[in-house]
């Protein structure tokens, strides 16, 4: 399936640390983006499903910023808050209750940020 345009290209929504890294190492950032697009395009999963999976991977690794980024991207790809919450809850028996609750709270933070920025449709 062809890669869809990356909503992360809107740099107003990415963390300052990431912006600084991209500014200092643009070739690495470009390579990272090319790999991400190639991986998304290599199989039959659509962008929405890929983002839901990436939420699970990010939460399993305990990566708050990445989890919130993929929550935002999943919403932009059409995922509902209920779908995002289910993606998080699916990890409970694998990564444990505390990490699941932490990831759920990170998603709530992102939903609230999106509401404040006028990106309706959040939980």
Where in this protein do the model-derived segments appear?
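Acidic, glycine/proline-rich low-complexity segments that act as flexible tails and inter-domain linkers
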Residues: 1-49, 103-123
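Aromatic- and histidine-enriched alpha-helix N-cap/loop-to-helix transition segments
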Residues: 47-48, 82, 95
């Amino acid at each position: 399936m062809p890669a869809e345009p990356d909503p992360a290209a809107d740099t107003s929504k990415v963390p300052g640390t990431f912006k600084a890294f991209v500014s200092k190492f643009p070739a690495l950032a470009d390579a990272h983006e090319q790999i991400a697009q190639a991986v998304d395009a290599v199989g039959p999963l659509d962008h929405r499903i890929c983002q839901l999976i990436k939420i699970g991977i990010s939460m399993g690794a305990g990566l708050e910023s990445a989890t919130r980024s993929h929550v935002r991207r999943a919403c932009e790809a059409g995922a509902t808050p209920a779908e995002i919450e289910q993606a998080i809850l699916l990890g409970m028996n694998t990564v444990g209750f505390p990490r699941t609750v932490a990831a759920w709270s990170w998603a709530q933070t992102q939903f609230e940020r999106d509401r404040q920025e006028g990106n309706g449709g959040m939980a």
